[in-house]
Amino acid sequence: MTTESLSVAAYESQAKQFKPEQGLAATNSNDVRLFLYDWFTHFEHAAGVDFYLSHLEDKNMSVTFPGQAPLTSHADFAKWYDNLLAQTLWNFHDVSALQIKRTAPQEFLASFLVNWYGEVKSNSDQLAGWQSRSDSFLYHHKLRQTWTVKVGDRLVIQELVVTGGGAPSPIQ
């Protein structure tokens, strides 16, 4: 369907969803995209934990992974991240099906799929929990992540939920 075949109201509605309501300098969905890719790039380069902590809400934080208790503080996340680095040699995140929706003037909801690839250390005491196949140290997990991101002086993740890759997006 071309834009000429849309009614004027439908055409303008489609275009206005991107209008910067809070000025040209306001954070928009492309800023959230950039942040999301930067987040995963830092994982792939084994960045220091301080990068993540500066982008995670500490008081009301909730980071949830399948089969684990939620991480609710910076200390919880730092412990989880230290374990990730201790158990793996490398990892890579292939992000797809990214959807971003503004849910409040200073809040976004992002949902996307991640094909997470990596290699667990052969001497890991958690080998079975990381492996995708019992005959390989390489792993591949397809996951859905859904983030609630707050806008302030920087983007901050308040809630991060990881589910199986077959879970539907909450953004319609």
Task: Outline where the language-model segments fall.
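Short, low-complexity N-terminal intrinsically disordered segments enriched in polar/charged residues
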Residues: 1-54, 62-64
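Short catalytic/ligand-binding loop motif for oxyanion handling, primarily in non-cytosolic enzymes
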Residues: 72, 119, 165-169
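Short Pro/Gly-enriched beta-strand edge/turn motifs at strand-loop
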Residues: 79-82, 125-131
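Short beta-strand edge/turn micro-motifs at domain boundaries
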Residues: 1-16, 107-109, 130-172
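Short beta-strand segments enriched in hydrophobic/aromatic residues
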Residues: 56, 114-118, 164
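A short hydrophobic beta-strand element
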Residues: 104-126, 141
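A solvent-exposed, acidic/Ser-Thr-rich amphipathic alpha-helical stretch
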Residues: 49-104, 112
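A broad structural signal for short, well-ordered beta-strand segments within beta-sheet-rich domains
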Residues: 27-35, 87-90, 95-97, 152, ...
